[in-house]
């Protein structure tokens, strides 16, 4: 079974209420993005990072993925949101169908809890070049993580 859509992981919603994730730019947690092949099977029930079906290390992409740069959480109207800076893996030969965003330093006993499942809709590839994850605009309508 392949990716089936974009999801906030159900466990992530619970962990927000437990105070597990800190998205602040300074002194916040460390979040990573790992890339996966079309053989990966993730849904909203996904709870933690796994190396199963992760793309092979290439160029600047290594096992576990890349570290994300947080964009400080903010509020617009009644919507709170946060986002990440775009992430580029250089000189990489990669074919990925989707990604997981997960927390490597949670304020709890969880191990690498997942936050978001991203489905690219189809395979995306680079050959000895840049593989870039472009995050949406950090605003109340578009940010990757929004709570309305």
Give residue ranges: language-model regions:
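Small cysteine-rich, disulfide-bonded extracellular modules of the LU/uPAR three-finger superfamily
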Residues: 1-97, 104-148
């Amino acid at each position: 079974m392949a990716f089936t859509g974009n999801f906030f992981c159900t466990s992530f919603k619970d962990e927000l209420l437990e105070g597990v994730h800190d998205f602040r730019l300074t002194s916040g947690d460390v979040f990573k993005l790992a890339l996966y092949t079309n053989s990966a099977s993730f849904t909203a029930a996904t709870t933690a990072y796994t190396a199963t079906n992760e793309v092979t290390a290439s160029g600047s992409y290594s096992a576990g993925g890349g570290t994300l740069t947080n964009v400080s959480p903010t509020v617009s109207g009644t919507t709170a949101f946060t986002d990440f800076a775009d992430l580029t893996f250089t000189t990489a030969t990669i074919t990925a169908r989707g990604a997981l965003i997960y927390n490597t330093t949670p304020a709890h006993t969880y191990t690498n809890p997942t936050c978001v499942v991203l489905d690219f809709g189809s395979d995306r590839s680079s050959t000895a070049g840049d593989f870039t994850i472009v995050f949406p605009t950090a605003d109340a309508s578009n940010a990757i993580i929004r709570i309305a």
